[in-house]
Amino acid sequence: KPFLMMYLHKAPHRPWWPNPKKFKEFAKKEFPLPETLFDNYKNRGTAAKTAEMNILKDLRYGHDSKIRPETMEEMFDLEPYVQPYNWGGNDGFTTSYVRFNSEQKTLYDPVIDSINIWFRNNWKGLTNKEKMKWKYQRYMQDYLGCISSVDDNLGRVLDYLDEEDLTENTIVIYTSDQGFYLGEHGWFDKRFIYNESFKTPLIIRWPNKIKSGLKITEMVQNLDYAQTLLDMAGIRQPSDMQGESLVPLL
């Protein structure tokens, strides 16, 4: 029977808690620094300089870097000072960690402990540039650990299509709701329409229709997806829909 399945992952959204296996694996990795990690926002307006997106100034010690509340209390005043906010918890332990069962905590704790020991012994002796590098690595380790799990589970879906002989008769569309800053301009999050955030992943596999390896550079938008699916299914598009089918580009 014909089917349409929407397979949605929350994993890349903050707070970033990879599964225990990925948490341990990625905590050992070191990632290359973006060229603009230490951007000084010269010749740009106030918004770029003051937005709460800076990795050094705005990533939370607990919520994002996995520093335990008791570690922060022991160290007293931490620099840079991170302004409290109202829309979420200030640490990842009162909002996320408390929901883990004892077995899960046992798997997470050795990695969390090693992060906290290093932080306690080294943080106050670091320069701001060194602190920025450390917080960037912690951000990447957890964010990309979550992304890796998404990749694994997308692979399970694609494997199922192969195993059930559905691959050649199934259109697969991989996309997201927006791009994301991974250290470019010293930022995390997504708020500004710079190139890194404005671009959104879009990969389509349509057997016997789309040539493998085809790259399209025309600008499209996510409001085009509904019309594209209708067009693929041979269904007339309602006149009150705003997007345009991408099929002619494919």
Short names for language-model regions:
Residues 1, 243-250:
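Short, intrinsically disordered, charge-balanced linker/junction segments flanking boundaries
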